[in-house]
């Protein structure tokens, strides 16, 4: 993938920072969008700018600016997300809108911008493995993420004439700052480990590897799919 041009939105998060490092290792050209925290990067990039991922206008403007910086955008990866684990009757209307906006609206904004601005490109969105199973207290996050999985199927059809591919990656529990409330809690971590037949939680590199596979132009016959990278969480039953 040497010299391919990739946009990464959410580049300063746990998965985003790993993906950016991995793409740099294979000599890709990077155009990075971040929210509050500027990515800590010590290698050259084409563009780095703040993006309000819950704003259609901000996403459209950022992707358009990136397009104008390079001869062709080979892929866009959208990584914004959140974890809110509560029974529905404890979730406020404000929390509901926050989760929907950060997860589903941000992904829709990327699909919207890609459909208008790009051709012959791979778009990868982030969902969660738990949309495939019924875990207690996950109603809010699966409501947002399941919409992303349906969206990649529809968008793959809508924009097939532009040679745009849309896929989603659904991680299990991954060791990132976003999941600290689980991974740093010994009891919660023990329970989570028992749900993954691989007997470990994921690392950002596990997710980065799948994203790199999907944005690689060599794999351009893959579209409209959700890939669960979850250590068996969604597909196996542990003793």
Language-model segments: which ranges?
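Substrate-binding pocket helix/loop in short-chain dehydrogenase/reductase
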Residues: 87-88, 92-100, 192
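A conserved structural motif in NAD(P)-dependent oxidoreductases
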Residues: 196-207
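Short, small/polar-rich loop/turn modules that mediate ligand/substrate recognition or access, typified
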Residues: 160, 165, 222-224
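Conserved NAD(P)H cofactor-binding loop of Rossmann-fold oxidoreductase domains
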Residues: 79-85, 232
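Catalytic loop of short-chain dehydrogenase/reductase
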Residues: 124-148, 152-161, 174
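N-terminal Rossmann NAD(P)H-binding glycine-rich loop of SDR-like oxidoreductase domains
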Residues: 12, 20
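Short C-terminal tail/terminal secondary-structure segment
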Residues: 212, 223-239
């Amino acid at each position: 993938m040497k010299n391919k041009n990739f946009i990464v939105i959410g580049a300063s998060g746990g998965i985003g920072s790993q993906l950016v490092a991995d793409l740099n290792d294979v000599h890709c050209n990077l155009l990075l969008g971040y929210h509050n925290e500027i990515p800590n990067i010590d290698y050259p990039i084409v563009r780095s700018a703040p993006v309000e991922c819950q704003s259609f206008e901000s996403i459209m403007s950022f992707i358009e600016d990136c397009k104008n910086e390079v001869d062709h955008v080979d892929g866009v990866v959208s990584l914004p997300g959140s974890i809110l684990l509560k029974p529905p009757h404890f979730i406020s209307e404000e929390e509901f809108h926050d989760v929907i906006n950060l997860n589903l609206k941000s992904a829709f904004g990327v699909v919207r911008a890609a459909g208008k601005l790009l051709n012959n490109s791979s778009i990868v969105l982030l969902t969660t493995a738990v949309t495939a199973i019924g875990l207690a207290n996950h109603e809010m996050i699966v409501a947002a993420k399941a919409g992303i999985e349906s969206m990649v199927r529809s968008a793959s059809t809508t924009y097939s004439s532009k040679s745009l591919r849309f896929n989603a990656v659904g991680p299990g529990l991954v060791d990132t700052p976003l999941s600290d409330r689980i991974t740093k809690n010994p009891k919660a971590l023990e329970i989570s480990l028992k749900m993954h037949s691989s007997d470990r939680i994921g690392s950002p590199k596990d997710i980065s590897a799948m994203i790199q596979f999907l944005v690689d132009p060599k794999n351009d016959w893959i579209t409209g799919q959700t890939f669960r990278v979850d250590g068996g969480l969604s597909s196996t039953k542990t003793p």
